Curated annotation (Swiss-Prot):
Keywords, alphabetical: ATP-binding, Cytoplasm, Kinase, Nucleotide-binding, Transferase
Compartment annotation: Cytoplasm
Role according to the record: Essential for recycling GMP and indirectly, cGMP.
Enzyme class, UniProt record, top EC level: transferase
PANTHER family found in the cross-reference section: GUANYLATE KINASE, GUANYLATE KINASE-RELATED
Protein name (Swiss-Prot/TrEMBL): Guanylate kinase
Domain Guanylate kinase-like: start-end pairs: 5-184
InterPro entries (UniProt xref): GK/Ca_channel_bsu, Guanylate_kin-like_dom, Guanylate_kinase, Guanylate_kinase_CS, P-loop_NTPase
Main localization, broad class: cytoplasm
Reaction(s) the record says it catalyses: GMP + ATP = GDP + ADP
Length: 204
Protein backbone atom coordinates (compact mmCIF):
# COMPACT_ATOMS: atom_id res chain seq x y z
CA UNK A 1 0.00 0.00 0.00
CA UNK A 2 1.73 3.16 -1.20
CA UNK A 3 1.40 6.29 0.88
CA UNK A 4 2.97 9.71 1.33
CA UNK A 5 6.46 9.65 2.75
CA UNK A 6 7.23 10.82 6.29
CA UNK A 7 8.85 14.23 6.68
CA UNK A 8 11.14 14.27 9.72
CA UNK A 9 12.43 17.68 10.79
CA UNK A 10 15.45 17.62 13.11
CA UNK A 11 16.20 20.95 14.71
CA UNK A 12 17.80 22.54 17.76
CA UNK A 13 20.32 25.20 18.79
CA UNK A 14 23.65 25.66 17.02
CA UNK A 15 26.31 23.32 18.40
CA UNK A 16 23.88 20.74 19.77
CA UNK A 17 25.10 18.15 17.27
CA UNK A 18 22.36 18.10 14.64
CA UNK A 19 24.81 17.32 11.87
CA UNK A 20 26.53 14.56 13.83
CA UNK A 21 23.24 12.90 14.77
CA UNK A 22 21.99 13.23 11.19
CA UNK A 23 25.14 11.58 9.84
CA UNK A 24 24.76 8.70 12.30
CA UNK A 25 21.12 8.25 11.25
CA UNK A 26 22.04 8.17 7.58
CA UNK A 27 24.68 5.49 8.21
CA UNK A 28 22.29 3.19 10.09
CA UNK A 29 20.52 0.67 7.88
CA UNK A 30 17.54 0.83 10.25
CA UNK A 31 16.74 4.24 8.77
CA UNK A 32 15.60 4.59 5.18
CA UNK A 33 15.50 8.37 4.96
CA UNK A 34 16.36 10.46 1.96
CA UNK A 35 18.39 13.42 3.16
CA UNK A 36 17.51 16.86 1.87
CA UNK A 37 20.69 18.84 1.26
CA UNK A 38 20.43 22.47 2.35
CA UNK A 39 21.76 25.50 0.50
CA UNK A 40 23.99 27.99 2.33
CA UNK A 41 26.13 31.05 1.74
CA UNK A 42 28.55 30.23 4.56
CA UNK A 43 32.03 28.93 3.84
CA UNK A 44 32.62 25.15 4.05
CA UNK A 45 34.09 23.79 7.27
CA UNK A 46 37.01 21.33 7.05
CA UNK A 47 35.80 18.02 5.64
CA UNK A 48 32.48 19.30 4.30
CA UNK A 49 31.66 18.38 0.71
CA UNK A 50 29.62 20.54 -1.68
CA UNK A 51 26.43 18.74 -2.71
CA UNK A 52 26.69 16.27 0.16
CA UNK A 53 26.78 18.34 3.34
CA UNK A 54 25.45 21.57 1.80
CA UNK A 55 25.15 23.32 -1.52
CA UNK A 56 27.62 26.15 -0.97
CA UNK A 57 26.46 29.10 -3.08
CA UNK A 58 27.03 32.82 -3.49
CA UNK A 59 24.73 35.43 -1.96
CA UNK A 60 23.47 36.32 -5.45
CA UNK A 61 22.49 32.72 -6.21
CA UNK A 62 20.72 32.43 -2.86
CA UNK A 63 18.69 35.59 -3.47
CA UNK A 64 17.79 34.24 -6.90
CA UNK A 65 16.43 31.07 -5.25
CA UNK A 66 14.31 33.14 -2.86
CA UNK A 67 12.80 35.22 -5.66
CA UNK A 68 12.08 32.10 -7.69
CA UNK A 69 10.23 30.42 -4.78
CA UNK A 70 12.74 27.56 -4.96
CA UNK A 71 13.06 27.19 -1.18
CA UNK A 72 10.85 25.41 1.34
CA UNK A 73 12.38 27.54 4.06
CA UNK A 74 15.27 29.94 4.43
CA UNK A 75 16.88 32.02 7.12
CA UNK A 76 19.86 34.12 8.05
CA UNK A 77 22.02 32.99 10.96
CA UNK A 78 25.17 34.72 12.23
CA UNK A 79 25.62 36.54 8.93
CA UNK A 80 25.00 33.58 6.62
CA UNK A 81 21.92 32.37 4.73
CA UNK A 82 20.58 28.81 4.90
CA UNK A 83 17.69 27.29 2.95
CA UNK A 84 16.04 24.02 1.89
CA UNK A 85 15.35 23.45 -1.83
CA UNK A 86 11.61 22.73 -2.20
CA UNK A 87 11.35 20.60 -5.36
CA UNK A 88 13.48 17.63 -4.20
CA UNK A 89 11.53 17.38 -0.92
CA UNK A 90 8.14 17.39 -2.65
CA UNK A 91 9.28 14.82 -5.20
CA UNK A 92 10.62 12.38 -2.60
CA UNK A 93 7.55 12.63 -0.36
CA UNK A 94 5.20 12.09 -3.31
CA UNK A 95 7.19 8.96 -4.21
CA UNK A 96 6.50 7.59 -0.73
CA UNK A 97 10.05 8.16 0.49
CA UNK A 98 10.80 9.41 3.99
CA UNK A 99 12.70 12.70 4.04
CA UNK A 100 15.01 14.04 6.75
CA UNK A 101 15.52 17.79 7.14
CA UNK A 102 18.23 19.10 9.46
CA UNK A 103 17.51 22.81 9.91
CA UNK A 104 17.51 25.60 12.50
CA UNK A 105 14.50 26.54 14.62
CA UNK A 106 13.36 29.42 12.43
CA UNK A 107 13.46 27.22 9.35
CA UNK A 108 11.49 24.54 11.17
CA UNK A 109 8.80 27.09 11.98
CA UNK A 110 8.42 27.90 8.27
CA UNK A 111 8.22 24.21 7.35
CA UNK A 112 5.57 23.64 10.02
CA UNK A 113 3.31 26.18 8.31
CA UNK A 114 3.72 24.61 4.86
CA UNK A 115 3.88 20.94 5.89
CA UNK A 116 2.06 20.57 9.25
CA UNK A 117 1.94 16.77 8.96
CA UNK A 118 5.70 16.54 9.40
CA UNK A 119 7.29 15.12 12.55
CA UNK A 120 9.25 17.82 14.36
CA UNK A 121 12.03 16.78 16.75
CA UNK A 122 13.95 19.24 18.93
CA UNK A 123 17.48 18.10 19.70
CA UNK A 124 18.63 19.58 22.99
CA UNK A 125 21.96 19.51 24.88
CA UNK A 126 22.22 17.99 28.37
CA UNK A 127 22.95 21.52 29.66
CA UNK A 128 24.29 24.87 28.44
CA UNK A 129 27.80 24.20 29.75
CA UNK A 130 28.05 21.15 27.49
CA UNK A 131 26.63 23.12 24.56
CA UNK A 132 29.31 25.81 24.91
CA UNK A 133 31.98 23.12 25.26
CA UNK A 134 30.90 21.57 21.95
CA UNK A 135 30.86 24.91 20.13
CA UNK A 136 34.32 25.84 21.44
CA UNK A 137 35.77 22.42 20.58
CA UNK A 138 34.52 22.76 17.02
CA UNK A 139 37.28 25.34 16.64
CA UNK A 140 35.62 27.26 13.82
CA UNK A 141 34.18 30.30 15.63
CA UNK A 142 35.66 33.40 17.25
CA UNK A 143 34.86 34.28 20.87
CA UNK A 144 32.41 36.89 19.60
CA UNK A 145 30.55 34.38 17.42
CA UNK A 146 30.50 31.82 20.25
CA UNK A 147 28.89 34.40 22.53
CA UNK A 148 26.31 35.16 19.84
CA UNK A 149 25.54 31.46 19.40
CA UNK A 150 25.08 30.93 23.16
CA UNK A 151 22.79 33.95 23.46
CA UNK A 152 20.73 32.65 20.54
CA UNK A 153 20.67 29.12 21.99
CA UNK A 154 19.01 30.34 25.20
CA UNK A 155 16.17 31.78 23.13
CA UNK A 156 15.89 28.77 20.84
CA UNK A 157 15.66 26.21 23.63
CA UNK A 158 12.45 27.89 24.81
CA UNK A 159 10.98 27.27 21.33
CA UNK A 160 10.93 23.55 22.11
CA UNK A 161 7.22 23.85 22.94
CA UNK A 162 6.46 24.19 19.22
CA UNK A 163 7.83 20.68 18.51
CA UNK A 164 6.35 17.20 18.70
CA UNK A 165 9.28 15.57 20.50
CA UNK A 166 12.37 16.57 22.51
CA UNK A 167 15.47 14.37 22.35
CA UNK A 168 18.49 14.97 24.60
CA UNK A 169 21.78 14.56 22.75
CA UNK A 170 23.86 13.31 25.67
CA UNK A 171 25.47 10.76 23.37
CA UNK A 172 24.92 10.34 19.65
CA UNK A 173 23.98 6.67 20.09
CA UNK A 174 21.27 7.47 22.64
CA UNK A 175 19.86 10.30 20.53
CA UNK A 176 19.70 8.08 17.43
CA UNK A 177 17.97 5.29 19.39
CA UNK A 178 15.32 7.70 20.66
CA UNK A 179 14.71 9.10 17.17
CA UNK A 180 14.46 5.58 15.77
CA UNK A 181 11.71 4.81 18.30
CA UNK A 182 9.86 7.98 17.33
CA UNK A 183 10.03 7.15 13.63
CA UNK A 184 8.77 3.61 14.18
CA UNK A 185 5.82 4.89 16.21
CA UNK A 186 4.96 7.63 13.71
CA UNK A 187 4.79 5.15 10.85
CA UNK A 188 1.96 3.24 12.52
CA UNK A 189 -0.12 6.17 13.76
CA UNK A 190 -3.69 5.70 12.56
CA UNK A 191 -3.97 9.13 10.84
CA UNK A 192 -1.01 8.15 8.63
CA UNK A 193 -2.28 4.72 7.60
CA UNK A 194 -6.08 4.91 7.73
CA UNK A 195 -6.47 5.83 4.06
CA UNK A 196 -4.40 2.80 3.05
CA UNK A 197 -6.81 0.53 4.86
CA UNK A 198 -9.86 2.33 3.55
CA UNK A 199 -8.59 1.66 0.05
CA UNK A 200 -7.86 -1.95 0.93
CA UNK A 201 -11.43 -2.47 2.09
CA UNK A 202 -12.80 -0.87 -1.08
CA UNK A 203 -10.68 -3.17 -3.24
CA UNK A 204 -12.13 -6.22 -1.50
Amino acid sequence: MAHQGLLLVLSGPSGVGKGTVKSAMVKQKAFSFEYSVSMTTRKPRPGEVNGKDYYFVSEDRFQEAIKGNELLEYNEYVGNHYGTPLAPVQKMLNEGKDVLLEIDVNGAKQVRKLMPDGVFIFLTPPDLHELKHRIVNRGTDSDKVIAMRMKQARKEILMMEDYDYAVVNDTVANAVDHIKSIVEAEHVRVPRVINDYRNMVKED
